[in-house]
Amino acid sequence: MLKPGDPGGSAFLKVDPAYLQHWQQLFPHGGGGGGPLKASGAALALGAPQPLQPPPPPPPPPPERAEPPPDGLRPRPASLSSTPAPSSTSASSASSCAAAAAAAALAGLSALPVAQMPVFAPLAAAAVAAEPLPPKDLCLGASAGPGPAKCGGGGGSVGDGRGVPRFRCSAEELDYYLYGQQRMEIIPLNQHTSDPNNRCDMCADNRNGECPMHGPLHSLRRLVGTSSAAAAAPPPELPEWLRDLPREVCLCTSTVPGLAYGICAAQRIQQGTWIGPFQGVLLSPEKVQTGVVRNTQHLWEIYDQDGTLQHFIDGGEPSKSSWMRYIRCARHCGEQNLTVVQYRSNIFYRACIDIPRGTELLVWYNDSYTSFFGIPLQCIAQDENLNVPSTVMEAMCRQDALQPFNKSSKLSPSGQQRSVVFPQTPCSRNFSLLDKSGPMEAGFNQINVKNQRVLASPTSTSQLHSEFSDWHLWKCGQCFKTFTQRILLQMHVCTQNPDRPYQCGHCSQSFSQPSELRNHVVTHSSDRPFKCGYCGRAFAGATTLNNHIRTHTGEKPFKCERCERSFTQATQLSRHQRMPNECKPITESPESIEVD
């Protein structure tokens, strides 16, 4: 028997020649202390396993479904097949051979890149995402002791001497899980009770009778379709949230790596289509602050008319939510096709583009998201007389303003640095709640390039990166404390000035009410240069400012000649004269006659 302490010993076991050939095909390079695998008749020499040379990495495989499947759709566990030991081998010999084969398999698995590892490799790559990335490759592995895993030597190293394998992941493979897409497959549910024989596979539509264009396909389907026993079997019981799935959408496997299921369009969805409302459990901000909700993946915020956080809608529990919980969030603006809209106290999804059939629905905020929450982009250029070019390469998109900056720019899909323009700050929050008049329309002020300052150029992006921490974007403007999530910043009570939490993003002034901040932000807007000296409001024209100042002074220069009423504006006088019963002339009283 081979002892663990013998570094170069060998053990000769009687093994069937077919079994030897099987392992030689699996490990063609061999791995014994004295060289490759040796066979003498029916004898096999197994030594200490050596690491194998890693083969060239193929394209990355589809990631493992990290999310558990919904109720009623749990797949069967995958069966593991192994080569059985020959009957002529004794129990002890079989166990020794299995141990040696497992050691060789472990050495070979540790030398393989992530692309050739089993399906659990993407999960291991996601588990060490917080570890600082090496310049080119990322070493993945599990450490026996506490602390993060560290990279070993060169490629193909087994581990740290304790039998723990380590793996290597390139930046391209990590980029796949951040920006790539996996294959999407439609999951048939048969939740509709229409006759399957009348469904056209080419038109993807249910018809009464044969399809006029693809009729012969139905006859063939009935002949070679399901058997009578399978057709007589009742359909599986579907979860409650899947029974309400409309015909316009269907369940599918998500294209976002690491997610199991998603929702795709079963037919073309036109731009402007509303989906909702989003169903879930109402949670107070205090309950979320206590940390009761662990999974915030299906959590939406509801704000009142003043912009104050009112409550949350949690769709994490499938029994109390709907199928909309499986509409995933878009990772970048290129794959977004839905925008989230708050109408009164409900959450709806609105199609921002025409969604073709077979496309997964992905939702995110619209461009007015930063304006609503008062998140101005921090200006780097301090020179007021800065010469601004007449054209701008590309405006900063929503994700650039909200997502943290990565330490390395190699993972960017485009690989190019972009110029950023400081947008105009609106005088009020455009993403506000609606009254009974109609749905919400998220407006956004257009950018005036001549009056704006360029935040960054392709040569000064290092300054922009230094303004923000690597993984902490949400920063308090008074105590400069940073947070990883925006909700944590909203629940933060600043110790520096708790009575005036609303701070201007352009200057150091802070206010106690959001309305005061909105009135103050107008003073920084460049398109309203005429400012009132009484209340501080700014206007775009001098005439509008003069009409406004008369409301403070009480001056009424516009006088009606018939009834002698005075008005502050000429439009008020004109409207007064057009009203038939409003302007009444003053009747002169007759002169009195004195009688002697």
From Swiss-Prot:
Domain SET: 247-366
Biased amino acid composition, Low complexity: 37-50, 77-92
InterPro entries linked to this entry: PRDM6_PR-SET, SET_dom, SET_dom_sf, Zinc_finger, Znf_C2H2_sf, Znf_C2H2_type
Primary localization: nucleus
EC class name: transferase
Region described as Disordered: 25-92
Expressing tissues: Expressed in a variety of smooth muscle-containing tissues and displays especially robust expression in the cardiac outflow tract and descending aorta during embryogenesis. Also enriched in vascular precursors during development.
PROSITE patterns on file: SET, ZINC_FINGER_C2H2_1, ZINC_FINGER_C2H2_2
Listed GO CC annotations: nucleus
EC number: 2.1.1.361
Zinc finger (C2H2-type): 474-496, 502-524, 530-552, 558-580
GO molecular function: histone H4K20 monomethyltransferase activity; identical protein binding; zinc ion binding
GO biological process: methylation; negative regulation of DNA-templated transcription; negative regulation of smooth muscle cell differentiation; negative regulation of transcription by RNA polymerase II; neurogenesis
Bias type Pro residues, positions: 51-63
TM spans (from-to): none
Location(s) in or outside the cell: Nucleus
Function, in words: Putative histone methyltransferase that acts as a transcriptional repressor of smooth muscle gene expression. Promotes the transition from differentiated to proliferative smooth muscle by suppressing differentiation and maintaining the proliferative potential of vascular smooth muscle cells. Also plays a role in endothelial cells by inhibiting endothelial cell proliferation, survival and differentiation. It is unclear whether it has histone methyltransferase activity in vivo.
Family according to the record: Belongs to the class V-like SAM-binding methyltransferase superfamily.
Subunit relationships: Interacts with HDAC1, HDAC2, HDAC3, CBX1 and EP300.
Protein name (record): Putative histone-lysine N-methyltransferase PRDM6
Source organism of this protein record: Mus musculus (Mouse)
Protein encoded by which gene: Prdm6
